[in-house]
Amino acid sequence: MASIMEGPLSKWTNVMKGWQYRWFVLDYNAGLLSYYTSKDKMMRGSRRGCVRLRGAVIGIDDEDDSTFTITVDQKTFHFQARDADEREKWIHALEETILRHTLQIQQGLDSGFVPSVQDFDKKLAESDAYLQILIDQIKLFDDKIQSCKDDEQRKKIEDLKDTTCSMVESIKHCIVLLQIAKDQTNEEKHADGFISTINPVDSIYQPSALESVVIPTMPTQASPVPESVQVCKGEPRPSSLAVGPVVSNLGSRQSPTPISTGSGQSAPSSSLTSPSHVNLSPNTVPDFSYSSSEDEFYDADEFYQSSTSPKRCMDSSESATALTHSSTGASLKRPDTTESLNSSMSNGTNEAEQFDTHDDRDDDGEGESVEEHKSVIMHLLSQVRLGMDLTKVVLPTFILERRSLLEMYADFFAHPDLFVSIGEHKDPKDRMAQVVKWYLSAFHAGRKGSVAKKPYNPILGEVFQCHWALPGLENDENPEAVSEGPIPWASKNNVTFVAEQVSHHPPISAFYAECYNKRIQFNAHIWTKSKFLGMSIGVHNIGQGCVSCLDYDEHYILTFPNGYGRSILTVPWVELGGECTINCSKTGYNATITFHTKPFYGGKKHRVTAEIYSPNDKKPFCSIEGEWNGIMYAKNANGENTVFIDTKKMPTVKKKVRKLEDQEEYESRRMWKDVTFNLKIKDIDAATEAKHRLEEKQRAEARERKEKEKQWETRLFHEDGECWVYDEPLLKREPSLRY
């Protein structure tokens, strides 16, 4: 490519809260993107600002084909090209520039010495051994601190311990990254020898470093390697470079949406010798990216500035050795509780003791520090690649939430009273409004904290069963069991729930709920596509649910929003996004619900809006706005505002699950009990081993079915077209209940 490329782009400014036209010059040799208010100012050398490209990260968004971001030096710069083609030209040029200036030429290549894989393994084992020695020595600090009588001396020891813990954490990361780098070199390469570094998803655009680089037209330049490593993957495309592992330092990302003010811009041009360019030699490159008005040109508030010295020792759950089953090393065991699963497995006689209550826990650890969140996510970044489906990844055990995805779906019914009251309304208009109310209340209970953790990927054939007692009916003196229902030991006044993992590839979960006395049921299936998106993690929920109100023969078809884990390297938080619908074909009532993601240039988190329509009406009779995990307000056709839902004041009803010893071996809590227990006591090695046993058993069963040419037979659900339907729904068991 040419040594210099120039052209117009629009740049987002915080002062003007909009896009402004700028003339950009990309200097390949200097690794610098400079910008000017006009081409004339560029010719006079009046530079407005610049972006250093060494160690930079490029971000793109598949929902907007003209914008992109560059994150470097703890700043995020937002740009907008004229169209997708122009953005591709800039990104391609920026990619090659970043590649060149992010590389570190291996020392010793000129001498002809080429280390072998055996040399690498030996050094890696030595590093791990020294790490274990250091970890053992750290334990002596606690004894020293306790025995120290002098406050000043104790403070010095505590500071020394903090510094040592910080160093241990860095060493752990280094060992993990070295192992990942080794594994990456063994991966199968594309037939043409090229690996693309672009994957147009809601993600970052991240170039990859070269294992060995030869750029015939450009002199090479050594550069320090940045702190963290991420591996990217995409579709093959023409390139002159063989691409391998990547080095980057990530920040948070939000997608810009304003319309470009740079319409009619000319395409970027490039030239080797154009006299109009202001050439910059490497020694004129500034130490940091800057603008003439710093906070005018980047979103500084997007980044959390952490302390330079973390004030905590790395938890065992963050141990680098738990990243893969083949990793070596040791983890720190720090039991923080004496509680065990055995406490919920005692054989009691009263009703309260017949069920397992270990769901009354704070899995998400809201009190954990931001640094701990960052450390967890850094391990994830080290293992996965851009655009990779996380359901296909053997995740490090410590990043898992202590429950199965099937159990998480049960939280849709944390307000069972709202669900069963749908059929109590006589007017179809009110029934639709009640369906929307239950739907909007169904999401906040599933997310109690901000830590980016992932439920267990359910095993094929895994089942989860539970039920809820309706408020006010908890002490039913004469409960009548539903022997033919999904939960035979539940009463007719209970809301019962059952879920099954009906497919492993693709991962599809089906679940069903009913209340016999209220004559209502719900059937749904969700195919989860969990993708690593660089700056965030996205979960696309593909599928639908159906609320069936048997007394009126009404069926409400609904869809589910996508989920995103944002700002995963700073203060992680979860948001929902996407447009969902609820339709009743019989009555014609319908609703549109939009979960709004937070834009980078402002706005609130967790916003949701909804509009409910009567049949054939284009104007909604009810508009809803608020936060899906807070308060939502309804505005009727007369303009009156009322509180629609207040999730802060609505108590959730605890689900009831059978004791572990009463469960079948394929039920979720029993199947995952060893993993759950060891995660709870922070024994990550034991949890990893238990998880590995489950995965190996699943693989062995799959091989056996393949050898015997047998198909998997589901337990409770069957496929009906593109849907998965419960075998014995209430509508089928009680035909007399039909309208």
Curated annotation (Swiss-Prot):
Task: Mark out the compositionally biased spans (Polar residues).
Answer: 249-259, 277-292, 306-330, 338-352
Q: Where is this region: Disordered?
A: 220-292, 306-371
The UniProt entry, under Gene3D superfamilies, shows:
1.10.287.2720, 2.40.160.120, 3.30.70.3490, Pleckstrin-homology domain (PH domain)/Phosphotyrosine-binding domain (PTB)
Instruction: Kindly name one Pfam family recorded for this protein.
Output: Oxysterol_BP
Q: Which UniProt keywords apply?
A: Lipid transport, Lipid-binding, Phosphoprotein, Transport
- CDD domains named in the record: PH_ORP9
Q: Write out the GO MF terms.
A: lipid binding
The coiled-coil regions, if any, are: none
Q: Which domain of life is it from?
A: Eukaryota
Q: What is the catalytic activity of this protein?
A: a 1,2-diacyl-sn-glycero-3-phospho-(1D-myo-inositol 4-phosphate)(out) + a 1,2-diacyl-sn-glycero-3-phospho-L-serine(in) = a 1,2-diacyl-sn-glycero-3-phospho-(1D-myo-inositol 4-phosphate)(in) + a 1,2-diacyl-sn-glycero-3-phospho-L-serine(out)
Query: Which Gene Ontology terms describe the biological processes this protein takes part in?
Result: lipid transport
Q: Where is the composition biased (Low complexity)?
A: 260-276
Ranges where the PH domain occurs: 2-99
Which family does the UniProt entry place this protein in?
Belongs to the OSBP family.
Which PANTHER family does the UniProt record give? OXYSTEROL-BINDING PROTEIN-RELATED (PTHR10972), OXYSTEROL-BINDING PROTEIN-RELATED PROTEIN 9 (PTHR10972:SF200)
- Which purpose does this protein serve, as stated in its record? Interacts with OSBPL11 to function as lipid transfer proteins. Together they form a heterodimer that localizes at the ER-trans-Golgi membrane contact sites, and exchanges phosphatidylserine (1,2-diacyl-sn-glycero-3-phospho-L-serine, PS) for phosphatidylinositol-4-phosphate (1,2-diacyl-sn-glycero-3-phospho-(1D-myo-inositol 4-phosphate), PI(4)P) between the two organelles, a step that is critical for sphingomyelin synthesis in the Golgi complex.
What name appears for this protein in its UniProt entry?
Answer: Oxysterol-binding protein-related protein 9
Source species: Xenopus tropicalis (Western clawed frog)
